[in-house]
């Protein structure tokens, strides 16, 4: 699908991978709605690139319905959804203070996995009634997994479980939505230079980058966004989780 002229939704778009993805899609001609709970950050990014900022808690059905409705009224129904909203707290299952509070595990699952499914189901419901394009395609959904889905480290039980769920969701969703001409893909990024990592001391950033086989550096958000654009444009990419990690395989800690 050529994104030029089509409406797109990007969640978690106030910063990091989501912000850069929104910018790349706008440059490709898409009409982009930037969704985030951080509405001030989303507005700042939207003003910079020429998009529409909308507040949305992806774990809330009401929020998601309202945000998609507002985006649809401004840009028309979206043919592109990119799920970037997520959290990645590190906490051991059993620590010095005892077992991880169940609420903390549930929060990570709610945002990363349930939030992804919530946006996917609602966007797909809109896409299914659109006029088909080349190859009878009506839409494309790209979600964000993680290499932690495959090699979760100590302290990543909640995060790895949530991202493993996103990875596992991809193929059944692609199979189910194929009847409507909707593709479903996921990207599993490695260690990326998001604002959270860039806030670490330079020595820590260098150490993380050196752990990547090649190139020996942190991934750049633009590289993630460029892969999203490639997926959008490549109709035969469907039902796959693409690792974007410089051949990194995570150690236990």
Give the predicted meaning of each segment.
Residues 2-32:
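Canonical Rossmann dinucleotide-binding motif of NAD(H)/NADP(H)-dependent dehydrogenases/reductases
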Residues 87, 98-118, 142, 166:
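Catalytic Tyr-X3-Lys loop
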Residues 88-106, 125, 129-135, 155-158, ...:
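Conserved mid-core segment of classical short-chain dehydrogenase/reductases
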Residues 120, 162, 170:
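Active-site helix of classical SDR
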Residues 125, 174-176:
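Alpha-helical segment proximal to the catalytic Tyr-Lys
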Residues 146:
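Residue(s) in the substrate-gating loop at a strand-loop-helix junction
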Residues 178-183, 237-240:
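Short, small/polar-rich loop/turn modules that mediate ligand/substrate recognition or access, typified
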Residues 220-244, 249:
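C-terminal substrate-recognition "lid" of short-chain dehydrogenase/reductases
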